[in-house]
Amino acid sequence: MNTKQLKWFFLIVLALIWGSSFILIKKGLVGLNPFQLGSLRMIFAAGFLLIIGFKSLPLIPFHQWKYIALTAMFGTFIPAYLFAIAQTQIDSSVSSILNSLTPLNTLILGALIFKLDFKRSQISGVIIGLIGSALLILNGAMHHPEQNYSYAILVLIASLCYATNVNLIKRHLSDLSPLSISTGNFTVMLLPALIILYFSGFFEVIEIPKVQHSVIFIMILGTVGTGIANILFFKLIQMSSPVFATSVTYLIPVVAFFWGLLDNEMLTPVQFIGAFIILIGVYLSSKK
């Protein structure tokens, strides 16, 4: 494959992997609390990456470890817990749709912090995307009173974290291999994740069958949805642009919504409209 074909291949594979992550989180929360889930996700990913990528760690120059730590925090550590907490209160399909604001947030942060230029159509995209988000959240809160849609703000914060991560990688880590970045990230996160897991009460409930069942889902999420996916994503950022790489979030809701339907989740007609408006906003904000 040439570079153009390869970047689209990576984009589709990532959409399939990450679109399935939201239902894995939902299944994991059956037997785990959010802090146990987030910690196990990172521990499984770290174990997998250290096995295949340990030899790549010495290739990271000392002065770049601060950016490895920052991308670890914004790209995985904080979002891993935010998504898990949010999905205790809102559907996985709603969470995935709000996550599609990542390219829009990438553009905003790129302009405000990393001094990238805005265009008029992109400003329109930002406004339209925010309108769609408000519609999705407010209508969901009205029609699903059993869900606490104030937790949707956690998904929006996670989206901002992802956007920060993408800009940092493109600006400061483009010369490193994706395997080095991924392995470095999870090496940094391993000890904090183990500490949080220890104090989460996980080892008191590990023998309960539903907990063990949930751990299997999170093992898949950690190794495939986090470990392998991160390597592909970092490679995609390096071979394309931050906005193209984060446009994977156009496709993620389609996959996540399919899984949600199989698990008896349903959006209202107005929420469908809100989701469509968000995607229009993201599309406009991504246009060059």
Annotate each language-model stretch with its function.
Residues 28, 37, 41, 86, ...:
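Hydrophobic/aromatic residues within transmembrane alpha-helices
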Residues 16-19, 23, 50, 73-77, ...:
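Hydrophobic/small/kink-forming positions within alpha-helical transmembrane segments
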Residues 33-34, 91, 114-118, 177-178, ...:
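A helix-boundary/kink motif common to multi-pass secondary transporters
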Residues 49, 69, 118-140, 193, ...:
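Hydrophobic transmembrane alpha-helices of multi-pass small-molecule transport proteins
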Residues 20, 24-27, 31, 45-61, ...:
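Membrane-interface helix-cap regions at the ends of transmembrane helices
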Residues 6-10, 36-51, 70, 121-131, ...:
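Hydrophobic alpha-helical transmembrane segments of multi-pass integral membrane proteins
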Residues 17, 21-22, 50-99, 135, ...:
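Specific transmembrane alpha-helical segments of multi-pass solute transporters/efflux pumps
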Residues 48-58, 103-127, 254-273:
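C-terminal transmembrane-helix exit sites in multi-pass transporters
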